[in-house]
């Protein structure tokens, strides 16, 4: 965890982590700090408790988030990568706004699958003061996210809502008249429980910690079933999201989703063509050894997108 040259220029996590500052912000991190083979301070990223405390320190030191915790066995997100998605999405909005990232409570974002960690709303509000609606099918995850929001006094900035129909993503979620500048989604990656387990085992092995007698750790490759896999995997989930987005075409400026598997792009592009998207963007992202990309689509042409921003400014 030394140099991270591929991070977005506005990402707060460039270069080495400042462990003295992190420990000052959250002293509990000191008991998890080790010296890596290069003689630099680090943590054991195979220790889920260490990762959770590290995230808590990072959020407090870098973002002013005073209280953050998640239940055991829920995804513990790598924050630099999550922040990159926020910044890349912000640039997407800036492209139609004379190069300026729109900030403030007039900008509304929808996080599909907000999770127990509530990470995208926390980062997006901290960096750009956007307001968020976070949705999830899991009531335990929503209860955790709600506790984080309330503990940090963010109830006016971050609203949480359960998607009551597990077969739907967007359908039936939005209320009459709700409009969003942006949607975010980090979809389930795997197509089955077995595939998800194999993926966790690969990451476990890559950390050099493979031990058949030891339970797989939870950290950022743990997670509940609905966080890790869905029937049909990433391609089916994103294609369904594209299909459901049509009914909200006029109420959302840009829909976006992360796509981990490049091999899924042709199928997603075909779904977007079928849906009649007027603008499509595929933006590569990379953090360390992990490559991903943001797929974005809009049902508004260039003139309509400019008008959207102008209308929002007039209401500010």
Swiss-Prot record:
GO terms for biological process: rRNA base methylation. Its EC number is 2.1.1.181. It catalyses: adenosine(1618) in 23S rRNA + S-adenosyl-L-methionine = N(6)-methyladenosine(1618) in 23S rRNA + S-adenosyl-L-homocysteine + H(+). Its main location: cytoplasm. The keyword Ribosomal protein does not apply. This is Ribosomal RNA large subunit methyltransferase F. Signal peptide: none annotated. Belongs to the methyltransferase superfamily. METTL16/RlmF family. It is found in: Cytoplasm. It holds the Pfam family Methyltransf_10. Gene3D superfamilies: Vaccinia Virus protein VP39. GO terms for cellular component: cytoplasm. HAMAP family: 23SrRNA_methyltr_F. Specifically methylates the adenine in position 1618 of 23S rRNA. NCBIfam families: PRK11727.1 (NF008725).
């Amino acid at each position: 965890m030394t140099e991270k040259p591929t991070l977005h220029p506005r990402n707060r996590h460039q270069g080495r982590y400042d462990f003295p500052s992190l420990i000052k912000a959250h002293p509990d991190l000191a008991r998890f700090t080790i010296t890596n083979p290069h003689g630099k301070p680090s943590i054991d990223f195979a220790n889920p408790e260490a990762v959770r405390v590290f995230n808590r320190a990072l959020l407090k030191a870098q973002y002013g988030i005073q209280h953050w915790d998640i239940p055991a066995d829920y995804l513990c997100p790598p924050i630099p990568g999550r922040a990159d998605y926020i910044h890349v999405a912000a640039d997407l909005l800036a492209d139609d706004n004379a190069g300026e990232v729109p900030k403030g409570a007039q900008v509304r974002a929808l996080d599909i699958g907000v999770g127990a960690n509530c990470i995208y709303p926390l980062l997006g509000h901290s960096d750009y003061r956007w307001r968020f609606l976070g949705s999830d099918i899991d009531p335990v995850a929503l209860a955790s996210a709600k506790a984080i929001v309330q503990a940090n006094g963010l109830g006016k900035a971050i609203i949480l809502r359960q998607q009551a129909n597990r077969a739907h993503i967007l359908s039936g979620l939005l209320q009459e008249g709700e409009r969003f500048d942006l949607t975010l989604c980090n979809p389930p990656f795997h197509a089955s429980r077995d595939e998800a387990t194999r993926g966790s085992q690969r990451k476990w092995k890559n950390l050099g910690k493979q031990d058949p007698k030891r339970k797989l750790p939870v950290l950022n490759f743990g997670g509940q079933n609905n966080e890790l896999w869905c029937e049909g995997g990433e391609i089916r989930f994103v294609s369904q999201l594209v299909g459901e987005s049509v009914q909200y075409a006029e109420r959302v400026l840009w829909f976006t989703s992360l796509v981990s598997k490049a091999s899924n792009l042709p199928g997603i592009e075909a779904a977007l063509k079928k849906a009649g998207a007027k603008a499509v963007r595929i933006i590569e992202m990379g953090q360390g050894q992990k490559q991903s990309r943001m797929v974005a689509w809009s049902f508004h042409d260039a003139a309509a997108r400019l008008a959207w921003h102008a209308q929002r400014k007039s209401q500010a």
